[in-house]
A protein has these predicted regions:
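Glycine-rich phosphate/pyrophosphate-handling loop used in enzymes and phosphotransfer proteins
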Residues: 1-246
């Protein structure tokens, strides 16, 4: 046995031991607290999926035509920065999607984002052809990110990118300017609030890109983000969201 190989054996054993401990630890947690569907509490076979198959099957696909109309209704043609829009599910005020969004946003469960992103990616793989060169999450301003501890759209984007087999590039888009919450603003005020909030960190050389956000309401945030990417030279910019608000 060579010197190098001999010296790497203990390191491998330690790493293997840590992996085993993690595996056993997770297994033990699953026995003590069996993973359950966020919405109906059914037991789940895979701890990393937030919802059971029946709850996922019960979600209603969002009509992309309605999303397109919302983008067209944005002030001064700003919605045209988005080449095509793909909202996955229609928002259900009392249903499974609400439970998932709530867990993602307010209950500090970022790992669900990646799993939900894979669901988005699976639907996109059927409709978005050819695939984009990279997936870019809509960023949070750093103050908001500090409050929440993570950006839920970045978690979704990672799952989408994984499923599409393309890189995820959270660093390509920045949000240097803080904005007010969009919740109680009119369509016009929402656009004014986010217009100019984003900037791209580098030249994007005609690359087709997919923006990922958690929810589409008027589309103003996605359009402002897409505009910043287009200003930096991106090719067509697509927008995918987990949910479409009423
Ligand atoms: Zn369920």
């Amino acid at each position: 046995m060579s010197q190098a190989l001999a010296s790497s054996v203990p390191g491998r054993l330690v790493r293997g031991g840590r992996r085993l401990a993690r595996h056993v630890g997770r297994g033990l947690l699953d026995v003590l607290y069996p993973p359950r569907c966020l919405a109906c509490q059914a037991r789940l076979s895979r701890a990393r999926a937030p919802l059971c198959a029946a709850c996922v099957a019960g979600l209603e696909r969002a009509p992309s035509e309605v999303a397109r109309q919302r983008l067209h209704a944005l002030p001064s043609g700003s919605g045209t920065a988005i080449a095509a829009v793909f909202p996955l599910w229609r928002f259900d005020p009392d249903g499974a999607l609400r439970a998932l969004q709530h867990a993602l946003k307010y209950q500090n469960r970022p790992r669900y984002g990646r799993a939900a992103g894979r669901w988005m990616g699976r639907a996109l793989a059927e409709t978005l052809s050819p695939p984009p060169e990279a997936v870019v999450p809509v960023p949070l301003h750093r103050t908001r990110k500090l409050e929440r501890g993570y950006n839920q759209s970045a978690r979704l984007a990672r799952g989408v990118a994984e499923r599409l087999g393309v890189p995820c590039r959270p660093g390509w888009l920045e949000r240097p300017h803080p904005t007010r919450s969009q919740t109680h603003l009119s369509r016009q005020a929402r656009w004014e609030n986010v217009d100019g909030a984003f900037s791209a960190s580098q030249s994007l050389d005609g690359r087709p890109l997919l923006l990922v956000d958690d929810v589409l309401t008027t589309g103003a945030t996605g359009a402002a983000a897409a505009r910043a990417l287009r200003h930096a030279g991106a090719g067509p910019v697509y927008l995918a969201t987990l949910a479409m608000a009423e």
